[in-house]
Amino acid sequence: MKKKVSFGESIIILVILLLILETAVIKFGLSPEVPVLFTVLLLTFWAKIRGFSWQDIQNGIKEGISVAIIPIFIFILIGALIGLWIQAGIIPSIMVLGFHLINGEFFLPSVFVVCSIVGVAIGSGFTTISTVGIALFGIGASMNANPALVAGAIISGAVFGDKMSPLSDSTNLSSAVAESELFAHIKNMMWSTIPSFVVSFILFWILGSSGQMDLTKIERTSSILQQHLVISWWAIVPIILMLICAWRKIPAIPTLFINIAATVIMIFIINPHFSITALNNLIMNGFVAKTSDSSVNSLLTRGGISSMMGTVALIISTLSLGGMLMKFNIVQSAMEPLVKYLKKPGCLITVTILSGICINLFVGEQYLSVILPGRAFKSAYDKIGLAPLALSRVLEDGGSVINYLIPWGVAGSFAASTLGVPVLAFLPFTFFSLLSPVFSIISGVTGIGLKWSKKPTK
């Protein structure tokens, strides 16, 4: 017979599911799609034994997937745009420019800073990674840089930009859930963001300065790009167009459609004989490089709607699992009893961050990792006198920035698919995401930068 899931039962279920996923992905090195589907199967068996109907199970899956319909469509458009940007010479032009401007010793910190600036301007980590990030990744490959290190710098910068931009969905969501004013929220995040940024920059500088540039390979790659693709200052037009759309607060889907249309026009201007059939194949299957250098071919052969299908499959599977966990109140049952025991700010902030990390692990969706802890712990923050700004900062530091570190998470799977580097490879080098929750906890324990709505009673 169906009944309320107890705290103990919910913890046991979550631990078992996490052990299965971690063993499969980390110990055996399996891609996460099949292990996630297996956990969905196990949870389905448990639900039937506990008296849940097939309708309950289907509703859980449906509700879980529904939160990702828009992101999935955005991923499809980004896949199309990547192939188009390479064909139009946009990404190759950025690479050639980067070869001339970026010093090898400062390459990694430069990547981190550039992606941070672009991320703040655009307000989207996904767009930053899939556009400028790909170009910078290509430059890194030509310099013989460690791909995982370059990916870590790109993602760290993109996460910083996504976190600090007033145009970012996750930033606006955290502010709204905690009921704090947006720009006050961004300002308050500096207490954890600036230390994380500075330490990340130093680490990238130290690690980047230890490598050696292969000048011959850089010159050869630059020459091949200029021989086989159009390198032009006109490549900046779609980038400027994207920035204009961002600052005019045009949503992601119309922004991507506008950019796709502009890039298609550029392609036909560059090559009037480019056929509709070739355009269709480019959008569907991505750009296929056919140069004399196999490493350049591997670097530029990417994009297309089909390149995102593996990511889409993983997202649907993960959010099906997350939807069932939510529908059966497993996640809620594990969180709710904690609230009444959290009376010190350090403990409350630490548990809030850990809750966000756990929801990222179990549900795989960054928005829910902000919403659920926000709803569960808001009353506890009010009770001990912490301001909404304290909660909104913690929701960002333990929620949205962590999703990029989860192999089966929406953001993590997207970054891995787009850059071609597994999550577990770039995870140790995504310093900004790793440090943000640490500095947030330090702030909570020490009281430095902690905002109060009323003075705590001693």
Feature map (PLM): residue ranges:
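Short, amphipathic, aromatic/basic-enriched membrane-interface segments that mark the entry/exit
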Residues: M1-E9, G98-N103, G119-G125, S222-I231, ...
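Hydrophobic transmembrane alpha-helices of multi-pass small-molecule transporters
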Residues: M1-I70, T193-V199, G208-L314, K455-K458
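Short juxtamembrane and helix-loop transition motifs at transmembrane-helix boundaries
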Residues: M1-K3, I86-V96, V113-I117, Q212-Q226, ...
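C-terminal transmembrane helix pair
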Residues: V5, I11, V177-T193, F197, ...
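Alpha-helical transmembrane segments in multi-pass membrane proteins
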Residues: I13, L17, P35, T39, ...
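Membrane-embedded alpha-helical segments and adjacent helix-loop junctions characteristic
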Residues: G51-A141, S292-K378
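Hydrophobic transmembrane alpha-helices that form the pore/transport pathway of multi-pass ion
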Residues: N103-W191, S355-D397, K458
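Transmembrane-helix bundle segments that line or gate the permeation/cavity pathway
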Residues: A153-I154, V159-D162, P166-L167, F197-M213, ...
